[in-house]
Design a protein with these regions (language model features):
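Sec/Tat signal peptide C-region and signal peptidase I cleavage site
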Residues: 16-22
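Short, surface-exposed polybasic-aromatic patches that bind anionic ligands, especially phosphate groups
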Residues: 23-216
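Bacterial N-terminal signal peptides that target proteins for export
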Residues: 1-8
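Cleavable N-terminal signal peptides
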Residues: 9-10, 20
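C-terminal membrane-anchoring or membrane-association module
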Residues: 236-253
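A short, hydrophobic C-terminal helix/tail in secreted or cell-surface proteins
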Residues: 219-241
Length: 253
């Protein structure tokens, strides 16, 4: 991701409840403005099927371009399986969407621009791609400031060296080992189609025109509503919501 952002307009409405499974058009319209280690963190703003929506990213391996439009399939958390999300197709354990829901909730509940929100975002990326997160942070260490790489790694993995595996009591361990289920979260997975087809792309395989995103299935107040009020800060320009491995010039598996 780049750091060039311009304020340009006003976003209007909350997302409405979608069908359990449906195809839709998505345009990525903005970022929350917070970046860490050269990368913008969640939440982001998108137009999903004509509705302005706050979205959170759970995909560290692929990339999304601000202003780009793509076809995607929406799947409610209660209907997630191995064939209807990009991570499911990649062979990921779909039970981990319970952890994704927990961390998405933390991202949206954290103070905008806070170190807590940075930690929650990177922990969410680490659910399906812990090694990718570890490799990027190891290659781009931050040694000073309000949140060093060692502090971030300690919060996510329980180890300042960012081992890629979660120690008991760490944020990632709590998310994955507290019995959270996908069905308990009122959220929807937004998985991109392979360009020119109605076939879902597979995360980490290089055929995704955008990352996988998560959004609230039902319009509700609190943090998500606050973010939509802030979403008047639409963004323009060539900003990338990128995989850290790509920014580090590493190839994608």
């Amino acid at each position: 991701m780049k750091k060039a952002v311009q304020i340009c307009g006003l976003v209007l409405a909350m997302c409405l409840a979608p069908a359990a499974f449906a195809q839709t058009s998505v345009t990525l319209t903005g970022v929350s403005g917070q970046s860490y280690d050269g990368i913008y963190v969640s939440p982001y703003y998108a137009n999903v099927g004509g509705t302005s929506t706050v979205v959170v990213c759970d995909d560290f391996a692929d990339e999304s371009n601000l202003g780009s439009t793509w076809s995607a399939q929406t799947t409610s958390f209660s209907n997630v399986n191995s064939s209807n999300t990009s991570w499911g197709l990649a062979g990921a354990n779909t039970a981990l969407y319970g952890a994704v829901g927990y961390l998405t909730n933390l991202v949206l509940g954290a103070a905008p621009g806070s170190t807590t929100q940075v930690i929650d975002t990177f922990a969410l990326w680490a659910v399906f791609d812990p090694n990718g997160v570890e490799q990027y942070l190891a290659a781009h260490p931050i040694t000073s400031g309000s949140l060093t790489t060692a502090q971030l790694c300690s919060a996510i993995f329980g180890s300042s060296s960012c081992t890629g595996s979660a120690v008991k009591g760490s944020l990632l361990w709590i998310a994955e080992n507290s019995g959270f289920t996908a069905a308990q979260w009122g959220m929807t997975v937004l998985s991109a189609d392979i360009p020119g087809t109605s076939q879902l792309c597979t995360a980490e395989k290089g055929n995704c025109p955008a990352q996988e995103f998560i959004y609230l299935s039902v319009a509700e107040g609190g943090a998500a509503a606050a973010y939509l009020l802030l979403a008047g800060l639409c963004c323009g320009g060539a900003i990338f919501l990128r995989s850290k491995r790509q920014l580090a010039s590493r190839s994608i598996a």
